[in-house]
Amino acid sequence: NPAVVNYTTAVFNFRKPFFLFTFVAMSQKWIYKPEPDEEIVDGLISSIGFGTLESKILVLREIDNYQKAREFFKPNGTDIHNPFLMADMQKAVERIATAIENGEKILVYGDYDVDGTTAVALMYLYLSKIVDKKYLDFYIPDRNVEGYGISDEGIHFAKDNGFSLIIALDCGIKSVDKIDLANSVGVDFIICDHHLPGDKLPKAVAVLDPKRKDCRYPYKELSGCGVGFKLCQGLNTIYKIPESELFELTDLLAISIASDIVAMTGENRVLAKQGLKFLRKTRKFGLRLLIPEEKLAHFEISNIVFDIAPKINAAGRISHAKASVELMISDNLKQAHQIVNEIVNLNDERREMDINITQSALNQVLELEKVERYSTIVYDPSWNKGVIGIVASRLIENYYKPTLVFTEGNNGEMVASARSVADFDIHKALEFCSDLFMKFGGHQAAAGLSMEKDKFEEFKVRFEEYVKMNIQEHQKEPSIYIDSVVKPEDLNREFFNFHRKLAPFGPHNMKPVLVLKNVKVNGYVRLMGKENTHLKFNILQPTTGRNIECVGFRFGQFAEDFKAKTFDLAFTIEENHWKGNVSHFLNIRDVKFHN
């Protein structure tokens, strides 16, 4: 789905980037979504009372009748499905109940990214309400020592410390050999994952994953933390903590949904919306300290992506993600302050590392681009494993090709993060080469792998050949999908109110991209940023005589063109909150100048 990649771009464009180097301004292909059926639009206008523009935007999202509109704007809980529809849920609940009854020690285990650490925090906090903490602990693998997923070290930690049950979150679906090891030493596993399964499922007590072929759970796009939340719901049919306390944990789930860029539809959208409400009034000290006080009342998905996720991720990227979990579960304000200071410093270190490695990778790509290629593959053994995924995304912003960034692992193997373009399935491309890997996993848009060094040259040839044979024309250049052409007078209070109701935004429920044609700047063009990288200007709203502010991040190089020419403007709408007042501005996504 192109929305996945476009979402990343839209979020990144929303704020000033911190890079010292300059990205090439890449032109985008404008794809106008087909005009929806007039009869359906008219039917929606008469049934829900929105205007023509608003109704068109809804129909383009397949919200094409009163019932769907009601479910979208006022969900009644039917989208939060029965957890026992998920394969193995009953087994998982019964095994945990047995462990609690018998006084067994339970270890909550998770990946080191935001989805994994929020999942561990959520599960730990739920279990701590029903289990004495002396029977409970959590474990996050060290990215630099153990790598991704379930590790030998984690299993031996459990065995050596008397844990007979591990609940694994956001990992484990392909850990067949590791679960066999755990079984051989008497440690049971419950797996809660959302990644694509392999041909063979691990022999765990229970494997919860809505993407299992034999799973009849109706919603397939849960995050790893989301699968963990479903297990908590299942457990709560026995332990019955107040529902308000259970759903208070959705503040962590909202962070997971936003950070892992899963679909913002159905159950995810309902849970994200619920989670944002709890996040704005969260009682978790660590989260309160991460959120600027002035933003708290209006905290949205984009704020999670910018203000929380990078900091939570920084611990796992640069040091150890255990700090992120401790931050989210801490009930000690002094401890929470100390951890926040630590991860803010780690995030600053991560930013500096990101800048340097991205520049180094860009230098490599300049050499690679001398020969026509359909993919980008770069390698340097000195690059930090924790930031190569970010670097891959940066390279795509410049060169827009399926991209892998390799570095060296702890045991001399090569490890990589892969990122894709548009709807090109990079997981499938890697599957084509999987006989070369030690292990790999991921999604359509992003994946990771490890590989012996002597396989690298063959991999580059085979991956390039696969991309060349399978990539489609529309996947070779960045595209912007436009909902509607509008006039300045359409951008009024009623439309802004409607726009707010569409939130939370994310893949499959993107902010509408609109186009104004034949626009002229009204007054000045002001450059912004230390390097004059960004700009802002006004256009006139003729019916009110007021100006509408337009902001262009990384459009500073076009300041003279904006001053002198008419242009077509593709944009999304953003909100500013300041001292109780709300204003709106147009966030420029692309521009076409008229000669």
Question: Model features per residue range: what roles?
Answer:
Residues 122, 200-241, 246-258:
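Short alpha-helices
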Residues 486-548:
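Accessory interdomain/linker segments of ATP-dependent helicases and helicase-like nucleic-acid enzymes
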Residues 27, 34-165, 185-186, 236-458, ...:
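Hydrophobic helix-and-loop "lid/oligomerization" segment in the mid-to-C-terminal part
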Residues 545-560:
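Beta-strand/loop nucleic-acid-binding surfaces
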Residues 579-595:
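OB-fold/S1-family single-stranded nucleic acid-binding modules
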Residues 169-222:
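Histidine/acidic-residue-rich, glycine-tolerant segments that coordinate divalent metal ions
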Residues 556-570:
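Short nucleic-acid-contacting surface segments enriched for D/E, G, S/T with interspersed K/R
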